[in-house]
């Protein structure tokens, strides 16, 4: 909706936005990198062009210009969008539960009431996708603390992208640290595994990391967040007839990283371009080779033939950050991709590729 309303021909359209949640809490944080200022530049609460990477065998400062790593708080996003959308009389909001989506007579059922439309843009993923034998389905799950200290302890000019200096017993696990100021930072514990942990395990690992690697024992937890994102080779449907799937439901979560926000913006821009030209708004996803790259890495992680921390350590040890970030944004060229792939251990990736192909 926000992308549509940037264009006068689409501002005349009537839109109904349906969500079960009132969106009044700071329940999540989005991070991404891009070169240019995007639509949500005004609400990026912090940006960095200096990142840090840590593992047991590598500590490296990453200067990522012309990229900037950006952070958006959920509550800022909700307020910004609500304020902008409420200025348009054709936009209506409805808080309720979507009980059914109809692709024949295009519309939705919300709390027992039917609504019809020219198009339905659906962001609700299927509850029980049917996986093939080759499909990999891992979970990226994370718990984050916004911590505050009385003294200045953080360098707000640099963020930690990945820090693998922690137990890998459950699978690929790392923390990232996003300092908003010298005494306030988001510390997030992230795992790529088939199953979730017990709630207290996330807190225990976060407390250990903060104590051992941030050297902090005196701090306050101002906010906390928890989330789960699928990391999968499963091909989500683009939709049916005039129902267009968007977000994770439309395959906009990158399988190998879990990053979603940036890809949603790219997808939304393509949808708007189709609408402006009078065409059907179902658009192609990224080139198929990127899905293949994701599937190979996920297969490596599933087989545990090469631990995730070794994969990412090798990527950042042997490559400059800019091509790696372009690669992870599905924005790299074939020669760049070939160079990056050549730096990774051949055998585990070859086996995984063969398993995915055959």
What function would you assign to each model-found segment?
Residues 3, 7, 84-220, 232-235, ...:
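Predominantly flavin-linked oxidoreductase catalytic cores and closely associated redox partners
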Residues 3-59, 75, 143, 147:
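N-terminal FAD cofactor-binding segment of flavoenzymes
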Residues 34-96, 101-103:
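A conserved beta-strand/loop capping segment in the N-terminal third of enzymes
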Residues 42, 169-172, 226-245, 255, ...:
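FAD-binding beta-loop-beta segment adjacent to the flavin cofactor pocket
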Residues 195-225, 241-244, 265-289:
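Flavin-binding catalytic cores
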Residues 249-270:
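A conserved FAD-binding loop/helix module that cradles the flavin
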Residues 269-358:
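C-terminal helical "tail/cap" subdomain of flavin- and related membrane-associated enzymes
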């Amino acid at each position: 909706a926000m992308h549509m309303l940037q264009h006068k021909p689409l501002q005349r359209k009537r839109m109904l936005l349906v969500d079960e949640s009132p969106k009044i809490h700071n329940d999540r944080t989005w991070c991404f990198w891009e070169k240019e200022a995007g639509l949500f530049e005004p609400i990026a609460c912090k940006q960095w062009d200096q990142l840090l990477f840590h593992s047991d065998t590598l500590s490296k400062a990453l200067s990522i210009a012309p990229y900037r790593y950006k952070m958006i708080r959920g509550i800022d996003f909700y307020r910004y969008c609500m304020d902008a959308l409420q200025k348009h009389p054709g936009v209506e909001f409805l808080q309720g539960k979507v009980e059914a989506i109809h692709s024949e007579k295009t519309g939705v059922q919300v709390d027992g009431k039917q609504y019809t439309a020219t198009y339905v843009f659906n962001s609700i993923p299927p509850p029980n996708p049917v996986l093939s034998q080759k499909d990999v389905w891992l979970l990226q799950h994370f718990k984050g603390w916004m911590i505050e200290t009385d003294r200045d302890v953080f360098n707000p000019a640099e963020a930690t992208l990945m820090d693998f200096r922690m137990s890998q017993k459950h699978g690929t696990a790392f923390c990232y640290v996003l300092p908003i100021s010298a005494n306030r930072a988001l510390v997030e514990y992230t795992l790529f595994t088939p199953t979730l942990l017990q709630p207290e395990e996330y807190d225990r690992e976060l407390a250990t990391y903060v104590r051992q690697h941030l050297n902090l024992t005196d701090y306050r937890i101002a906010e906390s967040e928890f989330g789960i994102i699928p990391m999968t080779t499963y091909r989500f449907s683009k939709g049916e007839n005039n129902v267009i799937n968007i977000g994770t439901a439309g395959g906009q979560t990158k399988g190998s990283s879990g990053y979603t926000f940036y890809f949603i913006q790219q997808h939304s821009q393509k949808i708007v371009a189709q609408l402006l030209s009078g065409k059907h708004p179902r658009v192609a996803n990224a080139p198929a080779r990127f899905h293949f790259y994701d599937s190979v890495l996920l297969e490596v992680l599933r087989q545990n033939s090469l631990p995730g921390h070794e994969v990412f350590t090798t990527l950042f040890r042997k490559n400059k950050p800019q091509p790696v970030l372009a690669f992870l944004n599905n924005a790299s060229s074939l020669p760049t991709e070939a160079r990056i792939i050549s730096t990774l251990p051949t055998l585990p990736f070859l086996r995984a590729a063969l398993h995915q192909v055959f």
